[in-house]
Amino acid sequence: MTAALRIALIAPNRFPIRQPFAGGLEAHVWHLTRALVQQGHHVTLFAATGSDLAPQSAQLTVRALSRSAAAARPFPPPGAVVESDHRAYLDLMVELADRSVTGFDVIHNHSLHQLPIALAPRLRTPMLSTLHTPPFTWLESAIGTTAGSGRTYTAVSRHTAAAWGRVLDRVIVVPNGVDVHRWPAGAGGQ
């Protein structure tokens, strides 16, 4: 490595990034954060409160925001987007836009939320987004509207990369970052 990078790592914010992991995405981000810090990079993690940060890493706090009575009615319909996620990612992207002149060398997005993708062209800092799932409406829409804007996308498998082929011309496959010595393959679920 020639020089340490200042990396803003955007995690999903629904569950803390800590053991026991809520799922594979949380495990991936936890292992990646530690590996980057071990290689000498400076990582700032955007994640849910209660996340287990790697030594020498910082955290961008997910602020809890209360809703007004007028905003209490669900829109979009329940299950489509969680409002607290929307507000948290909007707040984060505004903060990153303010810091983008000098704050970070790269932003690495692992969220499943559309706002980091949709607002990435407004940042001066390059953003890499890792795709962990097949396309779904909100994320596909955001990627479709920003396609061709010089953003880089990676996927955790060839299957995931192929699933995004209708929207993206190029998705680089970087195999899932979970430490297979600590998480060996098992018999599988039901």
Model-flagged regions — what are they?
Residues M1-Q190:
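Catalytic cores of nucleotide-sugar-dependent glycosyltransferases that transfer UDP/GDP/TDP-activated
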